[in-house]
Amino acid sequence: MANPVGGMKHTLQAKDRNNAKVIVADPNFTKTAAHADLYLRQRSGTDIALVYGLIHIILKNGWEDKEFIENRTYGIDEIRKEAEHWTPEVTSDVTGVPVDKLLKAADILAHTKPGTVVWALGITQHSVGTSNTRILPILQLILGNMGKAGGGCNIIRGHDNVQGSTDMCNLSDSLPMYYGLTDAAWKYYCKGWGVDYDEFIKRFAVSTKEPKQGGTPVKNTVFEEYYYHDPKHPEDRNWRNEKGWSLSKWWQGVLKEENTFSSGALRVLWVQGTGLTSMAHLAKIQEAASKLDMIVVAEPFVNEISILSDRKDGVYILPVATAFENEGHLSATNRSGQWRTKVVDPLYESKGDHEVMFLFAKKFGFYDEYVKGMKMGIVDREIKQVKDDFVWPDDATNEIARIGNSIGYGGRTAEMFRRHQANWDKFDPDTLIGIGGEVKGEYYGKPWPAWDEKHPGTPILYDMSKPYAEGGSGFRNRFGLEHNGVSQLASEETTLVGSAIKGGYPQITKENIEKVLGITLTEEEKAKMGPSWSMDYSGIIFEKCREKGVVPYGNARARAIVWEFLDPIPKHREPVHSPRWDLVQKYPTFDDQARNFRVSTKFKSEQQAKDWSKEFPIVFSTQRVVNLSGAGMIERTSKYLSAITPEMFANVNPELALKYGIKDRDMMWIHSPQGTKIKVRCYHSQMVTPDRICMPYNFAGIMQGVDLSARYPEGTKPYVIGESYNTVTNYGFDPVTQISEFNAGLCRIEKAEENTFKTSFFHEYGERDAMGKE
């Protein structure tokens, strides 16, 4: 596990109640590591090598779950071949983890079951972040820990409803519920929204010029399947099928320093619910902010994007209500939902997020279409408008449930969430099962998939030991029926308890339902049924599956090979800026990416430009601070939370700091290969080794040594300001998600003079400066 602040309570409870063994793998010795039975300190950016080293030991000793692998997985043989290279000695050289600790970790994992793997941003924020998030589930598949209580993979979020916002796909590459951007997905949504598809798509521009490379359309990753309306006729490409700009590189849509592919330059930035200073490459964001036509910030507190540039106009700050002034449902990392009741109405001039968007839609003339989906319902197995007005947030919640078949939101209605909230005392805290009254037999918050209102929810994904009616399921059939002549369906020995179908079977569609389920549909059912379980508003497919005890998405094998990706199996690749030039030659990064999220991205050309470690010899990464979230703009406006962390700092090993003449609590400069720098307080700390430093990412208000606090609107300056780590984030992005490489960069440090301005605040103990002196 990494350093999941949100999971600390559960970790300690597991140790106390179940004598759970805790292994912490983290470049920094965290508070979680202090409670570990075994601590592995790997070099930043070597997680894949570390896990392959563990897999090597497990397979060599025959500790893998052979039956699970045989019946429920595909491609583990390829993992086995790759793991052969990662002997304990090779793994130790690359990661820095001693051989004896590798052997001990593998032994604990193999002989202490079930076991779960927990991670947070330390895994995702790398140029190999996607591969990182694949290798850990592969480890769990090899150990047979998937689909079991106490097993699986658990991603700990930094605050509430991250899972909910993920389900809503607040991204530029998919419609909500992971439907993607295909025409079929747009048609499905238009039907659910009650709007005409042919009229709707006229809102999108059609490009007649297609960038080409070597005479063929540019295509790098699986997600670029959305690039073309028709791959054979790229001149007919439609922007509705294109990914937009990513949060990591949106600024290139303004600056256009790299090759960009868009119908026009970005001119307006609307920021709502996002601490933009928690994004990488803040100097680029600052430059882009000064060139935009307009910036709109809809936040409860002043988002620091508002003060980054010195522009005197074109910035609009809309006061938006806090969580305590809003109502609706949220989703946790275990996929359970929970109703949040409004404490007070929005104060002063603030409005709820939805009110802001409603006003925006009215101003631009599409309000009626915007809210029509909340007026829809299912009548006689067909979706149609059933009311003239809507009730917020209940009808919005029900709209999500009605449309969200792809992950099984059908049973997650507003009525259900309110009912569960009123019966908190009737749920078992360990199993989540309702033990009495009107919630008996339902799991708390109906963790998705909850296929319809009769389904109890799914507390543990892929658990074959429970029947459909109790939340059981196999692995989803999503990637075809066979690959290279090998069936992608589960073996005949892998049958869901109570299922009418023995062994594996494909996802249920209109075309195959009669054959797979052994039923005969009426002509009326055929006419009203959607093309597949994920696009069926009628509910007929779910109903027929329920009768047979069959999960509608199929019963397949978990694939270790993603044949559409640049790396079909995860492979160790050195960070774009690596401290090991020798390993860069053995484990280079990806080739440069001609196009992803509307912009080209450097990989190998940046990594191979020179040995970056000669000028920037120190590895740096981020750390999470318990009392600060995201950009920290909420907590830094609280006097008491600010008192806990009154200044921006970097943890530096005393040996490293003194090498540069930097004493404990001195100010220091941190320089990046991008030519940027930040000025922060040096904290001598043993949590890091002499070759690396780490620091939080939750500050703003100072930019490369310059105090920006005078730019805050009167009365809105936080109690604490400071440099943002993200000013010195190294160049590096994941080729699939384009997430930035926050956690494996290089830097150099030097001593700095004290600030001539204050970064601290007043509290009841008197005024303190940044040194903490009275």
Which stretches of residues belong to each language-model region?
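Non-catalytic terminal/interface segments that mediate subunit docking, oligomerization
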Residues: L139, N241, R573-P575, P579-S642
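Long, contiguous, secondary-structure-rich segments that constitute the structural scaffold
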Residues: E355-A414, A500, K510-K526, S532-Y537, ...
